[in-house]
A protein has these predicted regions:
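Well-ordered secondary-structure scaffolds
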Residues: 1-170
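Conserved small/polar residues in nucleotide/adenosyl-binding loops
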Residues: 172-174
């Protein structure tokens, strides 16, 4: 039986079933399917075509509206097709199918261990970088972050606090 709380939420007991299991490294798949609707709003529009070679971090789809998000490849390889696939909801959704080959990364991705602590860019440029990166919230709806950072002109924010920590504590800890 699931325990529920008066303030809401469901706390399944099963979240600890793997606590005593070894951590294993997952194999890189031979094929990857990347959905174009990973966020609330309009599904992203592909910017690649069948036969294109992509690397980890290559932008493969751009926002298709104000409430939409860019999508980047999480694998390197060759685009096999752009088609629909039935997702976990049972509905057919647009997706990019990639035949995985190797582990090549976009050269423009900074993979260094250094951390940028201060940013001197104007607000508009920061929002553009966030939109280009396809950053979305992880609270369930995957709401595109740049939308939240574009308030009406009458509203002025003095600062933005970004909590870059997974909200589901059960998924974030081993």
């Amino acid at each position: 039986m699931l325990k529920t709380f008066s303030i809401g939420g469901v706390h399944p007991h099963e979240n600890k079933l793997s606590a005593h299991q070894p951590i294993i490294t997952a194999e890189v798949p031979a094929k990857a399917v990347i959905l174009l609707g990973q966020h609330i709003g309009a599904p992203a529009k592909p910017v690649v075509a069948k036969g294109d070679v992509v690397k980890v971090g290559t932008k493969i789809a751009e926002p298709a509206g104000f409430v939409s998000a860019a999508i980047h490849s999480s694998v390197s390889g060759k685009v096999a097709k752009i088609d629909t696939i039935v997702d976990a909801s049972g509905y057919a959704k647009p997706a990019i199918f990639i035949d995985v080959e190797g582990d090549e990364w976009e050269e423009t991705i900074d993979r260094s261990a250094t951390l940028v602590k201060e940013c001197e860019l104007p607000a508009e440029e920061i929002v553009k970088k966030i939109a280009d990166a396809g950053i979305v919230g992880l609270g369930g709806a995957c709401f595109p972050t740049q939308v939240k950072l574009c308030p009406p002109p009458s509203f002025k924010a003095e600062c933005v606090i970004i909590n870059a920590v997974e909200c589901e504590i059960g998924r974030a800890h081993v």
